[in-house]
Amino acid sequence: MNARSLSAIITIAKYFDEGELLRIMNSTNGIITVFAGSASRPFAQKMCDYLGVELGKSTTHIFSEGGIYVRADESIRNKDVYIVQSIGKDPNNAFTELIFWIDAFKRASANSITAIIPYFGYAKADKKDEPRVSIRARVCADCIEMCGADRVVTMDLHAAQVQGFFSKPVDHLYASALLCEYARHLGIVNENLVVVSPDAGSAKRARAYANILGCNVAIGDKVRIGHDENPNALEIIGDVKGKTCMVVDDFTISGNTLCKVAYGLMDKGAKEIYAFLSHAIVKEDAVKRIEESPIKMLVTTDTVDNTDVLKNSTKIKVVSAAPLFAEAVRTIHEREPMAYMFEHLPARLMEMSFEDTDK
């Protein structure tokens, strides 16, 4: 730093408090540009609405033989690029498109590239649990980094240790900030509420929710046979008789686990059953199963676009996680601590997250 620059800093310092001055000095010189993969266009648009920026202009084309073509239709040289793409429904094509986007931005001289992956479906494949299988989460992490991503932002990984598969920074967001606030909005948070984990593996998540809401925990004891999506719920550990039960989990595909736990809770005398999930990757049969179950309401986020299959649902409510991801982008861009962000979420974030939920 030369004498002239130092003099300028000393001159302006008297007009700002210490925190504001540090924020200005640390702020990146890049320009935020958000692009959408084909799996997450509505989500990315909501992020842009929150940030007050326009969605990046782009073209995605699927050729007749199934090949994917992507192109940024505006200059991104020296810009900070955020590409939004969930790996949920049709995960193979979604992932391939994501790494093509990252490569395209790298070759177009972006200042930085952040992969925003609202739902990272391959995080379920985090270990070699039988002979001669691939650790798919690690393969995905390697590809994302090799193609040029500088950072990854995702939410509620099925296996949190997947963060360790990346050598670049990973910002791991939590839906609990949104879902617990919506539980309060519903008026179910009181001394009669019990948070229920559908299995022992999710007990840590349930405890985190219970700590936020100030209530007790119960656990569903289940046995999963094979690698299909149809586990057998066996028992409920904990007192749920006459209680309002809030079942929490990271995702559902078939709805089988949730519904079997719900029936188990009813058998134990539960008064009402709600389900709160970070992600839902559902089809018509899963929606039908949930609609016919004892679950009074299922609340999830929009990390995976289920608009078509949920249009006739009376039980499933969707809160938007896009404002939370947008606030994370702002935090990254201004080089602020992510932990501080979660402790000081703006009121407008919750307002935007819930604005379409009760319609």
What is the predicted function of each stretch?
Residues 2-359:
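PRPP-associated nucleotide enzymes
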